[in-house]
Amino acid sequence: MGSEMCIRDSHPTEIEPFGGAATCLGGAIRDPLSGRGYVYQAMRVTGAADPTVPVSETLHGKLSQKKLVRGAASGYSSYGNQIGLATGFVKEIYHPSYVAKRMEIGAVMGAAPRRNVIRETSDPGDIIILLGGRTGRDGCGGATGSSKVHTDTSIETCGAEVQKGNAPTERKIQRLFRREEVSRLIKKCNDFGAGGVSVAIGELADGLTVDLDKVPKKYAGLDGTELAISESQERMAVVVDPKDVDTFLGYAKEENLEAVPVAVVTEEPRLVLNWRGKPIVDLKRAFLDTNGAHQETKVKVDIPSEEENYFDKWAVPAVGEKLEEGDVKGAWVALLNDLNVCSQKGLVEMFDSSIGAGSVLMPYGGKYQLTETQTMVAKLPVLEGKTDTVTMMSYGFDPYLSSWSPYHGAVYAVTESMAKIVASGGDFSKIRFTFQEYFRRMTSDPERWSQPFAALLGAYDAQIGFGLPSIGGKDSMSGTFNDIDVPPTLVSFAVDVAKYGDIITPELKTPGNKLVRFSINKDDFDIPMYENVAELYGKIHELTENGTIVSAYALDSKGVAAAVAKMAFGNKLGVKIDDEVTTDDLFDNGLGDILAEIPADKMAALEEKELDYTVIGTVTEEPVFVYGDVKITMEEALVSWTSKLEKVFPTKAVKGTEAVASNVYKADSIYVCKHKIAKPTVFIPVFPGTNCEYDSTKAFERAGAHVETRVFRNMTAEDIRESVEEFEKSIAQAQIIMFPGGFSAGDAVSYTHLTLPTT
């Protein structure tokens, strides 16, 4: 099991939103593939300026924020939907400084049976095979481009640096690598990312001779340099023993994949690239291993302002303004309408969260699917049998806190990501982190290095304090447009492993239950007291395991009021806030704290655990939020919460004029045969663009059928003829044909099946 990041595509997404976001996901999938991991779930976290502002206010040399957020969402979702990857969590963070450069980051979860992962050395004589997509000029300069400062002319000159994604081809690579007999032939593997052939193949052995003339091309006319550095997508390089080359190429052909031997491992430690029979690169490995010139810099750390302490201010200014006027209802409603609190359901619904049939949590929970989940959870993608093992992933980050203090921002990013895992039923002691950093462009100015230095120090301190490591990450230091810088960004992704039965969901369950706040202890500098937090999270996990806590929500800087409303929306239950709760308690910063729903008859369990807690309120049947004399109906709260981004990411379809047929047949009962003696054969054809064959196969096998799948090969006329003949035989022997869903030329193929007569 592993996770992978995709921060590097903030640059191309700013230039070409659709393609840049698509390659963000494609690149993230390829990295676990190099370890033979099958990616089964993705998390998308993005940053933008306000997308509701008029287009007329767009900066010169920039695309409008509305264009960026819509285009990037379309690109990422298109790629994920085509390749058949569930996007389990989607969140867009809004901050005015992301107008400098959009943030497009995320993470994916991948897994593979341990027996399938072979890691050996490359020996002289070994062959390197390039498989997958062809090479073109798209992506030339993408690696260096991602580190450029953006100017007024970047949008006109950097378009060629954006790669063109090809999800169906990458799906074929996934299928190939998922076959045990294939993965065990691979001695070493590398994906094609930044640097293209020169890096992907150049990293596989100390001595290499690469024949660039053998690299498959999208079109003629590419010179040696372009072939060597192009970052065209969906390509992999594998090292195999010479005796296994033909076998590997045969397996690739079965999956309808191009595969070509392009390099050989040599005894002499030199990297040689040949083009048209002549070497155009011939470098000593010792020189490459120096990693370039040694560099040092001075750092001058900015101390956060005590007067501007983020923990002493309202996270949403409109809330503070309303509270000064004595308008608690107005403050609560304004909070729900804030860009970083409001519903993003229109955005989330652009993504397929259920493909693969492994997702445990949907993005929104409850009877009305209105309570947003904070953690994505999925079962491991086993091909045979069943599993109750699940993986969990969450994120933590607040750009406003980080802008005040990058150190505190990183500390609480780690803490918040942990709290979300714990609130979903995870065991914090098993958590591992991976960080993504995104900062302004660095120069020789010592003050500009303050942000990454302070942020990394904060993340390091949090890891040491909690005793939990970060095992990966990515960074970018190019978040500058002219004189505008992105906010200092360190996003913590927390990953955990749990059992299916341990998971709890955040929507309120039952009227009469109590809402309880567990608060973390902080020192005089507003830093969490790590040992106390660890003890608290451990006890909360025990309470979720034994059923005392039935739902929970990790608080953020927006406080209790936002969390109470979001927990209530899913089942449209109300909450009566206790009279002892102050407005400060309702709206203050709650980073690291957890709000939990507990049945009234189980409250004694908190005393047994010797837990400090505050009773916030009681769940009610009537869908109203009551606080003293203040009453907010469910409808009022939902209107405020759902209206903010409706014009950017609509959730309401245009009303049709045609009457909907109401004569729908409804069966009183479903008959399932108990005596499964006969095993009908189901034939599932796998066409280019198909992506549901695995879950379809498992569904039929659970029902007692025998399933046969075949890939339709179309690289040559002979492949097509052979495939037609094979399909004809398989259809003749089958009782059912099932055409799984997928994409062909971007068009959805609907689920359908044919039952064949038997004679």
Label the predicted regions.
Residues 1-4, 8-746:
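Glycine/proline-enriched, intrinsically flexible loops and inter-domain linkers
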Residues 2-7, 753, 758-759:
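Single conserved hydrophobic/aromatic residue that forms the stacking wall/gate
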Residues 747-751:
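Active-site-adjacent pocket-lining segments in enzyme domains
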